[in-house]
């Protein structure tokens, strides 16, 4: 192909030159004549004779060809060089007769040079271009072509890669789903292969036993054995397929899941298609039917509930085991109709038509889309609040659906235990009702349940009988409430509920041997008092298993006999007033009849370990009495009991009746105590306690509670006392039984207690020792508040030994009185000093043992009265100002000589005197002015007088203006519980004080002082008391 530039370029002088050359060539056949031009005039070894400069030719050697080189730029063609071409190469390149450019111009100078060669004479004069024309874009056409191609290839590659990635992702997801589904399908195939090959032609439908939303249930016979057959219509084919596949899941065999036999389809006689599920037959039917026909005791009810929970927990568990895999399954239609009862009293779960297999957050239902509506449930009555609200947590479908099942399980618990006979003692068990049947009836609508459950947050109500405050009932109610909690995430898991149901059975079995967990309704108040607090009150004392906070804390625990008030259903009761008629006011009548004997250690211990001081005893009627149980000495201290006063033991009453009036008295709510201790200030607490615990006059004739401390002191010292009852019949007496022969009670600690009512009275007698309570072990004259029968009257006129310690204080360079130890009765009888020393030595050792234990250590940070009840009696107002001023004066004025005495008796030991009960008269000091002071709140009371008047006894209730007050105790500990000291008024207690020693000051003048711990207690109503003195140092004893 020739381009437009193929027009020959002619030189004007060429015609005649060609003619001349052709003539010469003819003569020289062997040589080639070519046009020659070399602007650079290079010497190529060619002779000048061979070049013709005139015509510009050259005679080439043999075998050479002619060539020409031109430059083409900007439309012009310039000759660059011509001559002979002698390079050896392809001979076909220069075989043309004309000089033709056939090759693409080289890239030198942007392709502007043209080169050609030829094999004839003067053929290189002109040239002809014979190569494909360049692109229309003259600027680097090859590069543009390569760039476009690269872009196209890149785009194509990216597109293919993207498609490949998408295909891989899709394939991976499909493979992942297919792998689980394939494993499931494989298991389904294995399960299908494991199904028995039964001929359904032998299946006979005998009777209709139930009809549901998705089909009917028949009792049938397959190969002569009873079976249950569920028949699905064609419209419910999907439910049949789903339930069949759930039953075929590997590892679905469980004791609490209904046993599946076979599933098949068949055509009826009228040409309809129906689907059959053959299952094991359970004669008792559904749980709903069973509960409507039967009641059960506690253990049977727990067995029903536990078996249902166990089956549900297995359903909710994902279980990979070898080549088999069981996914977690949500039932989604759990109710009492879908639970069947076996012959052994356990349950199985059935009806899995709406169940779903749960795999993480994915739902798997064969034959349906994965995004099946999870709000679909079987029964509206059992719908959880979040389902009614449409607020199911879709981000965690597995947990959400399990929580829906747990809500329904809580309703089933309620239905089961509403038919428990043990939870309705003394009354008929209510008829069976489904959950919310009282509120919405038998056919509730979705809107009804939405308003009731979701909006109003109501649940089935617990009956009044379930308010019994026992551990088993409380645990049951907590479990049910935790299952149907409004917050789905706060509900129990099935595994946790299973453990709780197992514990409920254990609690019942463990407690029924000690005391019935659920008692008759007449003892509800007593059980609430005993059982609701025995867990929160810490065990104290050297025998924690036998002690409780209600045990009376006394400073002496090792006496021969101790009078205790017992308030428990295990306490001894007296003989009934009327034999022919059952005493309705007595608690546990049969138990009282069986236990009206000598108390056993088990009953004695139980009566002490189940008490709490939460009742107000000011309102007791005269018919109540005191129960007396003697306490044996401990083995390591029996050698100390050598006094002959313990040998004379009379009949001891051991059983009295406990009436409902005792239980109907006001009790302190423990929650109020905690609230008072934590929230209110001291002043507010005092005001609250006055309002809450005010009661009748404790000093009235009908109140005998204040006689208890004196009787206790006398009994501890003598071990002998006769009691009589004035209004409630004769007490059960056991003649000729020594207190040491009766089972001992546990030793109690002498923990600091706050004072209760302690009215003091004057006694117009002459010189008698003063009474002062030891500051170390505080005031132990306490009011008994265990809420049971108490002693009304004390008519004994026999002498009683009272231990008295005289801690005299002497100044420097002064002698003390003699150390003769005597025991003198009020009527003049005096015991020997040897006996007194024995009792005194034993009492001192007992007091030391009370304060050496780690648990009994007294400190400010751990006050033991935090769990004690608040004051209940409103004490009389009268002389409290004088007593409080006296306490403040004694606290603020130190003893002369630089010695002080604190509550804990940490002061330096001082010399001690033993004096006679008659006392020694001393000089009276001038009374000092009284200063009004703010009422203090002592934890330990120092009730000793601060002055004496000329040998006569001083009343404690007198004002400090009668004499100069002496140094006294410092109150170091702050009482945490509120109380207030009110007026001290005269009562049957007579406590006299008198100066027994003299203390010399630095100036050498004598001043009347009092004994540090001298006491003398007398009975004002005809009885006598005995004062004992001891010379042991540091001993304070009552």
Swiss-Prot record:
**Protein kinase domain location, by residue?**
203-504
Explain what the record says happens when changing residue 485 to G: In PPH1; complete loss of function; no effect on localization to the cell surface; no effect on BMP4 binding
Q: How does it sit in the membrane?
A: Single-pass type I membrane protein
Q: What is the effect of changing residue 512 to T?
A: In PPH1; no effect on localization to the cell surface; no effect on BMP4 binding; when transfected in epithelial cells it results in constitutive p38MAPK phosphorylation consistent with a gain of function in the activation of p38MAPK cascade
Q: What is this protein's tissue specificity according to the annotation? A: Highly expressed in heart and liver.
Major location, coarse class? membrane
- Which residues are listed as membrane-spanning? 151-171
* Descriptive protein name: Bone morphogenetic protein receptor type-2
